[in-house]
Amino acid sequence: MKKRSVWGRCLAVLMTAVTLVLPGVQAGAKQSTGTRTLMMDTRSYQMAPGNLYDIKVSVNGANVSSSDAVVYSSRDSVARVSRIAGTDKYRVTALREGTTYVTSEVYGVHASVRITVKKGVQKRGEANRSVTVIGTATSQSEMRAVWIPYMSLDMSGQPDRSEAAFRRKFDTLVSQAKNSGMNTLIVHVRPFGDSLYPSAYYPWSHLLTGTQGTSPGYDPLAYMVQATHQAGLKFHAWVNPLRVSLKGLPKSFSSDNPAVIWKNDASKQNWTMEWNGEWYYNPGITEVRDRIVSGVREIVQNYDVDGVQFDDYFYPTTASAIDSVSYLASGTSLSVADWRRQNINALVSEVYAAVKQTKPAVLFGISPQANLQNNRNMGADVATWGSQAGYVDYLCPQLYVNSSNAVMPFDATAVTWRKLVTNPGVKLYFGLALYKADSNADGGTWITPGSVMAYQIQKSRSLGANGFMLYSAAFLENRQTGSEMAQVKKLLHM
């Protein structure tokens, strides 16, 4: 490390060495193991507004390079960090008085330096940062999941709707996922306020027989969990908590559907919400939240699931008309937007508590939209979920964009989410748009020589994300995505 000239006041000097050892791996093992070592001079600095200095990041180890490192400032308004093109250095620009932490991260290992920007401080020169990482992610430590949406389970239009036919359909999905290197399935079990299992709270899904409320004569969820575990994979039950209908589906509702019962009761008509011909449950009603919580508890209690996941369907609009009656009845002094976020937070925390009280080892996670403003508009308080305990075990934002996206480029958006998830008890996964790979989506920017998915997985790793989820299973073995999946399987050592 280079000698430095006069630096001004130095708050502290500390050499940090971090070694992470994954389960079953011995410290000091060869590079092919999961051992990761990071060494970084975490000297604290003061610098004046307008001053610059460069941070050098060197990365060595199996399957890693300097381009895998991510360096960022916790407060961009105090000091901004940018990579110096063509080098392994990052330039820190002091902007205004305050304190920030500049963090280097590579594959989940990180170290930070505290920077105080203060007027009158002597200008600094170059500061070296040396980072060494050994190893890479393993199939056991990394979430490698694929979503199985309701469309892939739909039997309603099939001439053969038997249990045997359903099993064959699901067995194919399991086989494709395993052959693609996945270790977890995220399976739709409640897409429309219904269920793909015998429920005390929701009607049978129309997906199984063509008619909502009609039993198929077998338990699809029981078989799906069994088949998934027999293949050595994990099973997360995917639940839409509020959505009752979407784009004309289902075509009809059973008489025992709670939404139908409540709509026909004059005193409970505000327990559901309608928007653009679609139907949702109203989370501002305590009894509605209780129903949703009971439905999740039922799954965790009766089935050997490894996790439960909500997706991004919360409030469908910012329009106040959809729940104005319940908002006024609440007597709250909060704005409509804040009241809605309070309702969703209550639902999320209540579901989390129910899961942990029933089976503490079962995970509860949410896969929200990647756009933070959209989340706020929908009542999804992702900043709270990612920073405070008692809400989720993981967040998996749907980063369905690539690096060419003009509004939300993948790399910058991923860094934003990395900064947002600050609670060490909350894991961060990234949802990736396999369905867009090698397609004309987004102006043809996804048509590449099979490299987008592998790049995004590598970038996710470099940011310290705990894994990824692909949308969807229908594209694992698909002519469109063949070259993309070949690169993914190579990356996963398949």
Positions of PLM-derived features:
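Substrate-binding cleft of secreted/luminal carbohydrate-active enzymes
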Residues: 391-409, 417, 424-494
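Catalytic domains of carbohydrate-active enzymes, especially glycoside hydrolases
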Residues: 168-194, 303-305, 463-467
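Active-site-adjacent "subsite" loops/lids of carbohydrate-active enzymes
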Residues: 136-167, 237, 242-298
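The substrate-binding groove and active-site-proximal loops of carbohydrate-active enzymes
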Residues: 152-164, 202-217, 275-290, 333-343, ...
